[in-house]
Amino acid sequence: MRHRHGLRKLNRTSSHRLAMLRNMSNSLIEHEVIKTTLPKAKELRKVVEPLITLGKKPSLANRRLAFNRLRDRDSVAKLFDVLGPRFANRPGGYLRILKFGFRVGDNAPMALVELLDRPEVDETENVQEAE
């Protein structure tokens, strides 16, 4: 019986799955929005939301726990210095998963994963940076 197994295998070995979710977590924390398949997005939520909850309580022990899961100093610094204070008053639900159509090659359902309360970027700023 398959009772109470709350993990998608995603057709990967456990080490590959761990590395993939770690890389996706780092990308999401760095860029604050990523595009991926829907099952990966749902698994990513289970990884990132507890990390942001850790970032709300800045202590050395929490930083070490976050570094143990992310293995990237820049991501841990952003988690505790930017994202923790941003979500200080929110009791959970830090991510938004938007369905994004289907991938051209294999028709896999795609999703856009983004952090809530992202600072808005004006289009004029992007044009000025490009020039």
From Swiss-Prot:
<comment type="similarity">
    <text>Belongs to the bacterial ribosomal protein bL17 family.</text>
</comment>
<protein>
    <recommendedName>
        <fullName>Large ribosomal subunit protein bL17</fullName>
    </recommendedName>
</protein>
<dbReference type="InterPro" id="IPR036373">
    <property type="entry name" value="Ribosomal_bL17_sf"/>
</dbReference>
<keyword id="KW-0687">Ribonucleoprotein</keyword>
<keyword id="KW-0689">Ribosomal protein</keyword>
<dbReference type="InterPro" id="IPR000456">
    <property type="entry name" value="Ribosomal_bL17"/>
</dbReference>
<dbReference type="GO" id="GO:0003735">
    <property type="term" value="F:structural constituent of ribosome"/>
</dbReference>
<comment type="subunit">
    <text>Part of the 50S ribosomal subunit. Contacts protein L32.</text>
</comment>
<dbReference type="GO" id="GO:0022625">
    <property type="term" value="C:cytosolic large ribosomal subunit"/>
</dbReference>
<dbReference type="Pfam" id="PF01196">
    <property type="entry name" value="Ribosomal_L17"/>
</dbReference>
<dbReference type="GO" id="GO:0006412">
    <property type="term" value="P:translation"/>
</dbReference>
<dbReference type="InterPro" id="IPR047859">
    <property type="entry name" value="Ribosomal_bL17_CS"/>
</dbReference>
